[in-house]
């Protein structure tokens, strides 16, 4: 077995004594640092490589901290308008995952980079931690690599904000195929709009 196989086996057994101790110590360290931190190398090299990371120029990894819990509706002093059924503030369920929020925050902070992918790293009672893989689309090492230079195309600017990363597509319900999923494509809103628009074809 190669070294990456051993590393991935370690990460699969997260309840082992070694991993529980490591994760607890690391979590303490992460709590002391800012919410978005650049790393020298990925903490999970096997996972990062599976998701597109390469240890070469132009590739960077950032750790992002996201607060756990539900999303409160951002209304000043809790003043909401409309019918009582739509006046909820606290027990609303956010439609995207914490991982996609982490990708979004990294993408906003680092506007010149492109988000490739991300993965779970750690969590405690208050926060979840993710590592985000980003590339520099202006770097020649990226532009000349046929495996990644697709991301230099301007249509891939801020793909994390438009639900185009792996996690974004998952949150949009685009992982499945077949007749059970045809209402999710091209998007749930587009399908709703098509089904709720009265279209009177002109008689010719």
From Swiss-Prot:
State the Pfam families in the record: Ribosomal_L15e (PF00827)
Q: Name one GO biological process term.
A: translation
Where is composition skewed (Basic residues) in this entry?
A: 171-192
Q: Residue ranges under compositional bias (Polar residues)? A: 193-204
SMART domains, per this entry? Answer: Ribosomal_L15e (SM01384)
Q: Which GO terms describe its molecular function?
A: mRNA binding; structural constituent of ribosome
> Ribosomal protein: is it a keyword of this entry?
yes
Keyword Ribonucleoprotein in record = yes
Q: Which family does it belong to?
A: Belongs to the eukaryotic ribosomal protein eL15 family.
Q: Which PANTHER family match?
A: LARGE RIBOSOMAL SUBUNIT PROTEIN EL15Y-RELATED, RIBOSOMAL PROTEIN L15
Q: What is this protein called?
A: Large ribosomal subunit protein eL15z
Q: Which organism is it from?
A: Arabidopsis thaliana
Gene symbol here is RPL15A
């Amino acid at each position: 077995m190669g070294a990456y196989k051993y590393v991935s086996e370690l990460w699969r057994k997260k309840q082992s004594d070694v991993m529980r101790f490591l994760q607890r110590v690391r979590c303490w360290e992460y709590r002391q640092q800012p919410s978005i931190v650049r790393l020298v190398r990925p903490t999970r090299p096997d996972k990062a490589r599976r998701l597109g990371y390469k240890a070469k120029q132009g590739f960077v990894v950032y750790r992002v901290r996201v607060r756990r819990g539900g999303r409160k509706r951002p209304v000043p002093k809790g003043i909401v308008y409309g019918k009582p059924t739509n006046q909820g503030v606290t027990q609303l369920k956010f439609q995207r995952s914490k991982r996609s929020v982490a990708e979004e925050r990294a993408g906003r902070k680092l506007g010149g980079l492109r988000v490739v992918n991300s993965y779970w790293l750690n969590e405690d009672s208050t926060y979840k931690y993710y590592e985000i893989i980003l590339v520099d689309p202006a770097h020649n090492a990226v532009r000349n690599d046929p495996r990644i230079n697709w991301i230099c195309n301007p249509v891939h600017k801020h793909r994390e904000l438009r639900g185009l990363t792996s996690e974004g597509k998952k949150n949009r319900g685009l992982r499945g195929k077949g007749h059970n999923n045809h209402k999710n494509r091209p998007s749930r809103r587009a399908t709703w709009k098509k089904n709720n628009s009265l279209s009177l074809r002109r008689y010719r």
